């Protein structure tokens, strides 16, 4: 009975910690809306907002929903350093390959259509990919406090950079993209230094077999995420 109560308390504690991090991020996003509507041209803000929606749409394809996979597998591998290294290294290699593919396709697309803010769009997508993986990694190893702190750092950085670029420097709509890039960089760096995850990325830890196994789990989940945002694109 005591063991059950202890597990319930731990579950409530972890749920609350994660809620704090997510709530902070959502609250800051809510605070930014009046800032955007007051200082940005409607067409500029609308364009960037649509771009962010497209990024949300293609991100699951870029990372093949491997953020869900890393969370799922690390839960069972928290105490197995060898398997953890295989999981992290294999997915890191996958992300690097996918990023090169993204760069190639983006370059070709931009040559044809001349997309505004293309560099910021590419960097935003890349950093969203890394931050998504990093956040699910830190959750997977059970560091929920670190997860919440990283989310809060990302949210506060987004707020500060937006205020500086939009209000003080009058940079315009691209400020939103720049702020997400910087915020995600800070988020990834914090998680990297807190968890020392880079120590788990080793050449001899790459496992093609493990990667295929994880992709079998994650790829079927791609449509689920894309359907959440495709109505906004339409």
PLM regions: where:
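Interhelical loop/hinge segments that connect adjacent transmembrane helices in multipass membrane
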Residues: 1-11, 119, 145, 173-177, ...
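Signature of the first transmembrane helix
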Residues: 10-64, 154-159, 219-234
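Membrane-water interface segments that mark the loop-to-transmembrane alpha-helix transition
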Residues: 13-25, 51, 56-110
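Residue-level recognition of transmembrane alpha-helices
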Residues: 18, 22, 49-52, 91, ...
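Membrane-interface helix-capping segments at transmembrane helix termini in multi-pass transporters
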Residues: 40-51, 76-89, 99-126, 168-177
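C-terminal transmembrane helix end/exit motif
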Residues: 70, 135-140, 144, 166, ...
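Membrane-interface junctions at transmembrane-helix termini in multi-pass inner-membrane proteins
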Residues: 73-76, 128-151
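Hydrophobic alpha-helical transmembrane segments
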Residues: 119, 149-197
């Amino acid at each position: 009975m005591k063991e059950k109560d202890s597990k319930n308390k731990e579950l409530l504690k972890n749920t609350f910690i994660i809620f704090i991090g997510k709530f902070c991020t959502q609250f800051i996003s809510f605070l930014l809306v009046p800032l955007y509507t007051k200082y940005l041209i409607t067409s500029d803000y609308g364009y960037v907002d649509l771009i962010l929606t497209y990024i949300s749409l293609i991100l699951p394809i870029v990372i093949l929903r491997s953020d869900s996979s890393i969370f799922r597998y690390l839960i069972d591998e928290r105490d197995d350093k060898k398997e953890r290294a295989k999981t992290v290294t294999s997915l890191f290699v996958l992300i690097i390959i996918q990023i090169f593919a993204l760069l190639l396709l983006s370059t070709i697309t931009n040559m044809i259509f001349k997309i505004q803010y293309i560099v910021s769009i590419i960097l935003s997508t890349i950093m969203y990919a890394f931050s998504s993986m990093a956040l699910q990694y830190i959750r997977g190893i059970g560091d929920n406090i670190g997860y919440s702190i990283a989310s809060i750092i990302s949210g506060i950085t987004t707020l500060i950079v937006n205020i500086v670029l939009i209000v003080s420097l009058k940079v315009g709509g691209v400020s939103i993209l720049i702020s997400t890039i910087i915020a995600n960089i800070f988020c990834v760096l914090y998680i990297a230094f807190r968890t020392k995850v880079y120590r788990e990325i080793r050449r001899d830890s790459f496992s093609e077999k493990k990667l295929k196994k994880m992709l079998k789990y994650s790829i079927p989940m791609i449509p689920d995420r894309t359907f959440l945002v495709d109505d906004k694109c339409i």
